[in-house]
Amino acid sequence: ALITGSEHEKDRRIRFENAPRFGLVGKPLDMTYRVISTEGNGAPVDVRVSVNGEQVSVEHATVGQPMKLSVTIPNAGRNIVQLGIDREPGELTDANNRAIALVDGIRENLRVLLVSGEPHAGERTWRNLLKSDASVDLVHFTILRPPEKQDGTPINELSLIAFPTRELFVEKIKDFDLIIFDRYQHRDVLPILYYDYISEYVEKGGALLIAAGPEYAGENSIARTPLNAALPAMPTGEVVDKAFYPRLTDLGQRHPVTRGLDGSASEPPHWSRWFRTIGVKNPEGEVVMKGADDRPLLLLDRKGEGRVGMLLSDQGWLWARGFEGGGPHVQLYRRIAHWLMKEPELEEERLTADGHGMMLEIRRQSMIDDPGPAQVITPSGK
């Protein structure tokens, strides 16, 4: 045997022993790794654990022993779990002081709470879309009869069920991936304190969509409740009943929710008109679609760790019904919902890389005109 090198040389390396290729989003994933040293077993080693570039913990590993690790998969799609240890003085190389595992995040069925106000022409549009998606578990309530309504109907002749407000908005609110208020106005059905809970839910990472109609401009608007802390725009009180073609703004032409929307490339757009816009002032976030007189039509905003969307018209059902040829309501509504629930494919800023043989294909999704060059760092650190 021919042995090269010096007997005094030393090196440490880290590797994954067990790294599943798939994991459920938001759930812990069990993995196993090992730190190996040419000096045999030694003192415990600090191991930095990062997920998608963000350090999530520091583990203490015994050299030479298999170590258990539990990480939470944050996103659907590809996730990168990286382990790293510091270089020791005199080590041959630190190129093997890192280990990487690729984990594809898979969502369990998405839980969506849809709360509809009084019945209207487009009430079933959101319901039908969500019910048709096999990956969505939908909980839908329509407020047909508020508690303050008194018309003499005997209780034993009412066939309606009570709205389980405490169960939905206190006990189980964290279980929902998305809450939709479809033309909902404040009623005594929902105690005023519960709007605070919804705002807190958004701040901590939840998703909220307001599909607004004339009620948003009225005296019982949910903008007049503590929920206003989570809303991207306040109503002016105006309801503009005027025909218009929904159009993408300059920002909307680049935003992944609306970019390339079927029919948007022509002028006027190749879809039907709508006939109502709800006026708002001081919109925050991103205005990606505009309505009558260039008023904001679709707003997308971030609040704390969560996201909020606001559709300022109740006319989307015209696309669903095929009026004047209809429009891409399924494509638009689905993208809105999935952006709110942080689908990686719809992130405004996204960088991905895929290897094909000896070629590396880099893709960047960006809202800026000139994203600039990409920096590639090889395993050698260069």
Annotate each PLM feature.
Residues 1-382:
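N-linked glycosylation sequons
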